[in-house]
UniProtKB/Swiss-Prot annotation:
Disulfide bonds: none annotated. InterPro entries: Domain_X, Maturase_MatK, Maturase_MatK_N. Belongs to the intron maturase 2 family. MatK subfamily. GO terms for biological process: mRNA processing; RNA splicing; tRNA processing. This is Maturase K. The gene is matK. Pfam families: Intron_maturas2, MatK_N. Keywords: Chloroplast, mRNA processing, Plastid, RNA-binding, tRNA processing. One of its GO terms (cellular component) is chloroplast. HAMAP family: MatK (MF_01390). Usually encoded in the trnK tRNA gene intron. Probably assists in splicing its own and other chloroplast group II introns. It comes from Thlaspi arvense (Field penny-cress).
Length: 504
C-alpha cells in the first residue's frame, strides 16, 4: 500500500478531498484488480473471468467504462432494462461490479495511510504472529485469569443505507465520491430486489469495507468512553447526535467536571479493561463489580440506539461471570477453572502442606454447534451419526479422500488448543466414517466389504496428515506423540476461517 500511495502521489491535503477523479484513471483499475490486493478473496477477480458471459477481459473494458462515465446519466436506467442495457456485449450490471471494487480500493487508501502512520515508532511484540487468529488466545490466557466478568456483545449492523453513508461522511471529505457511493449503494439494493436468486451483485470487498468503516466509527467513540469512563457515568448519549460537535462537547464536559469535582475523578475509572473483537462480536473483560458491568451494558445499548439509530436490545449484551459461566468466542467455549495445587514444604525436622489455587483458562469445543454445521453440510445427521456425502460420490477416489483429509486437518489445527480432546476425536471419527461411506457408496458396496478389500491403509492420510505438521514442533518418539494429545497447541498461521467444505 505504501508503494501504491507513492505511485498515486497522495499528500495529507489531497488524500481525502480528491478521490473522485481516480474513477477516471485507467491505472487505478489495474491497482484495484492486482492479485496482491485480492489475495485473501476466494472469488476470482472479474477481470479474469465473468461468470455471466464466460468472456475474457482486457483494458478495453476499462476504457469503455470510463467513456460511459463521462457521458451524462449514462449509468441511470430502469430496473426493467437491467439485463437489456448492454454496451458492446457487457451489461450495466457488470460495470457496476467493476465500480464497486474500484470504490473499495480507492477509499481504502486514506484509511491504510492513517493506519500505517499510527504504527510508526511503536514496538510490536514479536513472540507470535499478530496476524494469526490464534494469537488472540494466548492474549486471553494471560489476561482473563485476572478478571471477574466478561461482557459478550453482538455488534448490530444498521439496516438503513443512509446510516452507512453518514458514517463514511466524517472520514471521507470528498463530496463527489460520497454522492457516487450513495448512488451505487442504492442501486445495488434495487438489483437485489429485482432478482433475489442472483449471486452477490457487488464485490465482497466493497461490503467488507462498509462494515469495517461502521465498526471503526463505533470503536472510536467507545475508546473515548473507555478513557473517560469515570466522567461519563451519568451522561446521556442524546447530546452526542452530531458527530462534528462530539469531541467539542465532550472536552467541555470534562473541563467543567474536573473543576467542580476534583476529588472523585478516579473512583470509577477502571485501568484493567480489555477489548477484543472478531467478526460481528466483541468481548469486554474487566475486574469490575456487577453494578459497573450493568452500566457498561447500558452504555452500549444507548450508544447504538441514540447515536447510530440502530435498535439494540439489551438481550444482545450478556454479562458472564468467568468463574461460573462459559462465554462463546471464535468457536470456543471458554471459562475459568480453579486448579487446586498441594505443595509439601520441609523445614528442618518439620514438614507441612501448602494449599495453592491456580486459575486457568479452559477452552472447550462446542460439539453441538459443530455437529449442527456438519449435519447442515450432509456429513452426518442431527444426532451426529455419519452418513455418506452423496454430492461427492461422482468424484474420483483421490479427490474424495483429499477433501475429507483437508477438512479434518483444518478442524484439527484450529481446535488444537482445546483443553480436552474428546470432542475433537468425535469430530474426526464422523469425518473418517463419512469418507468411508462415501467411497463405499461410489463403488456400490458396504462399508465392511469396502474396508476388507482395500485394507486399513485407506485411512492413513487421516492419521499421518497431522503428524507431519506437529513433527516440526516435537521430536518423533512414542512419548512425544503421546504428549501431542494432551498439550494445547495454538497454530499461528491461521489467518481466516471459511466454511468446512470449501476451506483450502
Amino acid at each position: 500500500m505504501x508503494x501504491x500511495x507513492g505511485y498515486l502521489e497522495f499528500d495529507g491535503a489531497r488524500q481525502q478531498s480528491f478521490l473522485y477523479p481516480l474513477f477516471f484513471r485507467e491505472y487505478i483499475y489495474v491497482l484495484a484488480y492486482d492479485h496482491r490486493l485480492n489475495r485473501l478473496n476466494r472469488n476470482r477477480s472479474i477481470f479474469v473471468e465473468n461468470v455471466d458471459s464466460d468472456k475474457k477481459y482486457s483494458s478495453l473494458i476499462v476504457k469503455r467504462l470510463i467513456l460511459r462515465m463521462y457521458e451524462q446519466n449514462c449509468l441511470i436506467f430502469s430496473i426493467k432494462d437491467l439485463n437489456q442495457n448492454t454496451s458492446l456485449g457487457h451489461t450495466n450490471l457488470f460495470y457496476y461490479q467493476m465500480i464497486s471494487v474500484l470504490f473499495a480500493v480507492i477509499v481504502e487508501i486514506p484509511f491504510s495511510l492513517r493506519l500505517g502512520s499510527s504504527f510508526e515508532g511503536k514496538q510490536l511484540k514479536k513472540s507470535y504472529n499478530l496476524q494469526s487468529i490464534h494469537s488472540i488466545f494466548p492474549f486471553l490466557e494471560d489476561k482473563l485469569t485476572h478478571f471477574n466478568y466478561v461482557l459478550d456483545v453482538l455488534i448490530p449492523y444498521p439496516i438503513h443505507l443512509e446510516i452507512l453513508v453518514q458514517t463514511l461522511r466524517y472520514r471521507v471529505k470528498d463530496a463527489s465520491s460520497l454522492h457516487f457511493f450513495r448512488f451505487c449503494l442504492y442501486e445495488s439494493c434495487n438489483w437485489k430486489n429485482f432478482d433475489i436468486k442472483k449471486t452477490s451483485i457487488l464485490n465482497p470487498r466493497f461490503f467488507l469495507f462498509l462494515y469495517n468503516s461502521h465498526v471503526c466509527e463505533y470503536e472510536s467513540i467507545f475508546f473515548v468512553l473507555r478513557k473517560r469512563s469515570s466522567h461519563l457515568r451519568s451522561t446521556s448519549y442524546k447530546v452526542l447526535f452530531e458527530r462534528i460537535l462530539f469531541y467539542v462537547k465532550i472536552q467541555h464536559f470534562f473541563k467543567v467536571f474536573v473543576n467542580n469535582f476534583p476529588a472523585i475523578l478516579g473512583l470509577l475509572k477502571d485501568p484493567f479493561l480489555h477489548y477484543v473483537r472478531y467478526h460481528g462480536k466483541c468481548i469486554l473483560a474487566t475486574k469490575d463489580t456487577p453494578l459497573l458491568m450493568n452500566k457498561w451494558k447500558y452504555y452500549f445499548v444507548n450508544l447504538w440506539q441514540c447515536y447510530f439509530s440502530v435498535w439494540f436490545q439489551p438481550q444482545k449484551v450478556n454479562i458472564n461471570q468467568l468463574s461460573k459461566d462459559n462465554f462463546e468466542f471464535m468457536g470456543y467455549l471458554s471459562s475459568l477453572r480453579l486448579n487446586p495445587l498441594v505443595v509439601r514444604s520441609q523445614m528442618l525436622e518439620n514438614s507441612f502442606l501448602i494449599d495453592n489455587v491456580r486459575i486457568k483458562l479452559y477452552s472447550k469445543i462446542p460439539i453441538s454447534s459443530i455437529i449442527g454445521s456438519l449435519a447442515k453440510d450432509k456429513f452426518c445427521n442431527v444426532l451426529g451419526h455419519p452418513i455418506s456425502k452423496a454430492t461427492w460420490a461422482d468424484s474420483s477416489d483421490s479427490d474424495i479422500l483429499n477433501r475429507f483429509v483437508r477438512i479434518c486437518r483444518n478442524i484439527s489445527h484450529y481446535y488444537s488448543g482445546s483443553s480436552k480432546k474428546k470432542n475433537l476425536y468425535r469430530i474426526k471419527y464422523i469425518l473418517r466414517l463419512c469418507c468411508v461411506k462415501t467411497l463405499a457408496r461410489k463403488h456400490k458396496s458396504t462399508v465392511r466389504a469396502f474396508l476388507k478389500r482395500l485394507g486399513s491403509g485407506l485411512l492413513e492420510e487421516f492419521l499421518t496428515g497431522e503428524d507431519q505438521v506437529l513433527s516440526l514442533i516435537f521430536p518423533r518418539s512414542y512419548y512425544a506423540s503421546k504428549r501431542l494429545y494432551r498439550v494445547r497447541i495454538w497454530y499461528l498461521d491461521i489467518l481466516s476461517l471459511n466454511d468446512l467444505v470449501n476451506h483450502e
